[in-house]
């Protein structure tokens, strides 16, 4: 990987080691989630998969742990991506695969938690029916259907993911239209990549995938310069020649907006002004001849310094792609709202029934475990969906939009943190699982010290036999 100084010498980028506080917090959450979640989920997989008898409950939580374990495996890539300030060194295959795994885990986890809630509700309301129909085979079939539905819902992530290289810097992006990158996936740190947009350029929010801090990087090599920001892309030639490109907004998990400045380019058709000038060979040529009159029309007056800050967060009219709306609201409704309604309804019915029916202590603990798991899931995922919806409608260039983008790294990290909570909840609240873990650890120690234990065991057995024989003789 190239060093910061090497990148600066080759492209004119000025990288600095400082990170935004929100970025540091997000990396800390991701790191803690990986350190705790990977061994925790691995232990649950080992115990529940190999040491415990197959029941309906173990099937539910075993599949849930598989989803969390796979998500934990992807966290180092996310941490490195944040540390590299948006640079994507892993290639296009992982650009498609890693975000797909994250969304796959999101849908699988929420569907499995919903199934657990429904299962417990049926056990309380319909105990006789459950006794006749509730079995391990049915639970496995339901889990298989859940994985299949989750896979179908994450297909758009895999299909539309692409890598985009700009000045030797590869970025992981979503591309909804041929030849045009609708939004970039990750953000750049303003202090690291550059110092904002040139004064003559008016930048408007665009569409990009991963929402994050307002930042930009700028290169000034050759006859033209490129400024890629969290919200927009603008290509500029020296001497006031400026062309506004299709906007692109760095966002998170499918929240992005497309806003194009409706500027008349003095005779140039409006639709031609919306072409991707980064891929326009004529524009990149230094021999492009533009008349003085056209140059005057192409230049944009410099706005006041606080022009954008004074605008309302909802000032601009956003044009959101239809596919973006489908993806965003599908995740919100199918992956959050409907499951939450089902969970709340199930536990409400359980509470009402428990008022009239006496519940044994073990059932109380199992119910408490499920409720805590669901509550933590909601706490982890609610900020992610709330931030995503707000970013669709709030101008990212406003103070409110900038604040949302700054803290969205934290909301994404918090959503990933849900993967490490479940195994520790099992250990704290599940007595049977704690017992199995102790037995498994004892087995490891016995295998490591098999010779000594064998001798000790033989001695104990011999002593017990002699005592028994002596007792029988005395009688």
From Swiss-Prot:
One of its GO terms (molecular function) is complement component C3a receptor activity. The keyword Membrane applies. The modification Sulfotyrosine is found at residues 174, 183. The chain crosses the membrane at residues 24-46, 58-80, 97-118, 140-160, 332-351, 369-391, 409-429. The modification Phosphoserine is found at residue 450. It is a multi-pass membrane protein. One of its GO terms (biological process) is calcium-mediated signaling. SUPFAM superfamilies: Family A G protein-coupled receptor-like. The keyword Transmembrane applies. Its main location: membrane. Glycans are attached at residues 9, 168, 273, 292. GO terms for cellular component: plasma membrane. It is found in: Cell membrane. Keywords: Cell membrane, Chemotaxis, Disulfide bond, G-protein coupled receptor, Glycoprotein, Membrane, Phosphoprotein, Receptor, Sulfation, Transducer, Transmembrane, Transmembrane helix. Expressed in the heart, kidney, lung, liver, peritoneal macrophages and spleen. Pfam families: 7tm_1. Disulfide bonds join 95-172. Residues 47-57, 119-139, 352-368, 430-475 are cytoplasmic. Residues 1-23, 81-96, 161-331, 392-408 are extracellular. It comes from the Eukaryota. Interacts with VGF-derived peptide TLQP-21. Belongs to the G-protein coupled receptor 1 family. Receptor for the chemotactic and inflammatory peptide anaphylatoxin C3a. This receptor stimulates chemotaxis, granule enzyme release and superoxide anion production. This is C3a anaphylatoxin chemotactic receptor. It comes from Cavia porcellus. The gene is C3AR1.
